[in-house]
Amino acid sequence: MKSFREHLFQLLHIDTIGMHYLKSKNIIINRFTLLSFLFCFLSYGCTGFFASKLVQPIENGKMSQVTHEGVTLHYVEVGDRQNPPLIFLHGILAFTQSYSEFIERLAEKYFVVGIDMRGHGRSTIGTQPYSHELIADDVILVADELGLDKFYVVGHSAGGFALLSIAKFYSDRVIKGVSIASLYNHEGIDYNEKNDDYLTKTGFMDNRNDRKNYTLKIFDRAYKKIGEGGKFDSTKRVMVGYGTSMFPSYEISDLRDIKTPILVIVAGKDDRIKPEHTIQMSKLIKNSKLEIVKGAPHFGIVKRKKYMDIVIGYIFNFLQPSA
C-alpha cells in the first residue's frame, strides 16, 4: 500500500527518481509540508501553474487555420517540410499546444502537423452533429490543405481513437499509425465512480451544480490563457448534450476491418483507459504491434520525460525502422 507521501508525490507528478533526489539532498518533507503542497495544488494559484504547463509554446511552430462548411480548424506545423509528414492528434479537453515537448521530439525526424480537433484549442465547434467520420473528414481537410497525400498519424487517448476512424474511412491516406493510451469503445473507459470526474457512464459532465473536478479547472484556466475560455465553455455544454453518443463505439468487426499497420502503446498504470482494453484492441487489429510502458499513467506517458523517451523510441522504430 502506498504511503501518504507517495500518493502526494504521484499527484504532483514527482516520480521515484525525484523522491530519491530529495532524500539524497537531505531535504526533509514532513507531513505538514506535504499538506501545504496539497493545499497549494488544490488552490486557484496551483491550477494556474499547471494550466501554464499546458500552454507552453511549441518551438518553431507555425500556426495556421482552414475554414470549411462552418468550422475553422486550427493547426500547427513543426519541423522540416522535407521530412516525412506526421499528423498528431490530442486527447479529450486538451489541444495541440498541451503536447509541446512531445511534438518537438517528433519533429526531430518528421514534419509534424498538430490539429486542434473541433471545439478544442483554437478550433471552432462548427454546426454539424458529431460523428466519428466527421473527425476523420476534418483531418483529411487539413491534410489536403497542406498537400499531404499520404502521412503517418500519432494520437493520444481520444486522438488514438480518431486514428482508428481515419484508418477506417481513409485507409489509402495513412501509411502507419500509433495509438497511445487509447480505446475503441466506451467499455475501455475507467470511470471514476465518485461524483467528481468529467467522464461518467452517462456521458461528459462539467463542473456545474457544485461538481468539482480539478482537471477541468486546470483546463478552464488553460483555455482562458489562450483566449478561448468562452469557446471551451460552449464545447463543454455541447459535450454534455451528446451524452454517451460522443464516446467511442466501434465493434470488434470495425477493428478487424482496419488494414493500416498500427502500433498500440499501453500506459501500464493508466487511470483513465483500462490497460487490458487497449491490449485487447491490439489483438483485434490485424497489422498491429503492442508495446506496454510499465508504470506510465494516462497523461504522464506523453508528459513525463522518462516515459516520453520510451514512447518516442517506440514510435521512431515502428514508423521507419531503418531510419
Describe every region a protein language model picked out.
Residues 77-122:
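Conserved HGGG/HGGXW glycine-rich cap/lid loop of the alpha/beta-hydrolase fold
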Residues 164-169, 177-208:
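Flexible "cap/lid" loop of the alpha/beta hydrolase fold
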Residues 188-194, 202-257:
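Conserved alpha/beta-hydrolase catalytic His-Asp/Glu region
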Residues 258, 264-266:
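Short beta-strand/loop motif that positions the catalytic acidic residue
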Residues 260, 274-283:
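Short alpha-helix in the alpha/beta-hydrolase fold that links the catalytic acid
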Residues 269-273:
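Acidic catalytic loop of the alpha/beta-hydrolase fold
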